[in-house]
């Protein structure tokens, strides 16, 4: 009788082990998500990431799955500590949103063998996250938000036919901003523009930086996805609005919430969703080292009638079918 009971118990244990081994999340998958700062485009990335994870069965608190989200509040030290925290806890994967989060995550995780999936990184090669976009060959891959530079310059030219000087405010330590600035400098002349750029080191210099650009005689501001600037964009518009200088955003939320008149916008929810799918693939066994970076560059023109009115601008005929945001 004891032998029969032992056999039954053994079979029961085998059944339980088989049932618990069905998926990664059932084994207790730990996913760390680090967002650099609390601003709209990065919030949208996070939403897309969480949507993808949840749809694929990775839900915090269910089937042993843990998803720990940290917002770095735009502070470099906070992001570094969060990255190391994920590594110390032995997380299975780290998802990092924006270049200033991705870089410390990769630095902390690479020796531990923890894969990093980044989102909204404009220049992954320049940031040292991958060796190439097609074949990363590191412990990181993810999605890149390549701005549609030509479409943005065409939009600015259409809205302000007489404009000559475009002001760009950027953070000197943000690799994504340096890459974007370089592209605008290369292309601006094709549209009759000159780029006047002003670098800053941190958020405390946004006010003085935009003041310097206004003093230099700019006709408008073209905003990047620079995290310091976007996170403090009310400081920018507090100076440009009274000076009668329109701002053009790098994505929709900068038009809807921050006062920009128009933008060739990327869909950051969709970008985040693709990031989440890539993380799911890696958790399922895909090799992060050979997974190509996914680049999003398709854009859509959007505008705000209310913001345009502040500067006496009218909607150009070429943009009559553009989408209005309110």
Regions found by a protein language model. Name each.
Residues 1-30, 55, 59-60:
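Short, low-complexity disordered leader/linker segments with a strong preference
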Residues 28-56, 68-77, 173-177, 227-231:
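Extracytoplasmic "Venus flytrap"
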Residues 57-79, 138-140, 187-203:
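Short beta-strand elements in bilobed, periplasmic/extracellular small-molecule ligand-binding domains
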Residues 31, 49, 141-191, 291-308:
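An alpha-beta-alpha
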Residues 68-131, 226-241, 245-250:
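Beta-alpha junction/loop-to-helix N-cap segments that form part of ligand/metal-binding clefts
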Residues 27, 123-165, 266-286:
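Hydrophobic alpha-helical segments within soluble ligand-binding/sensing domains
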Residues 280-326:
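Hinge/cleft segment of the Venus flytrap/periplasmic-binding protein
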Residues 175-245, 249-251:
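Pocket-lining segment of extracytoplasmic ligand-binding domains
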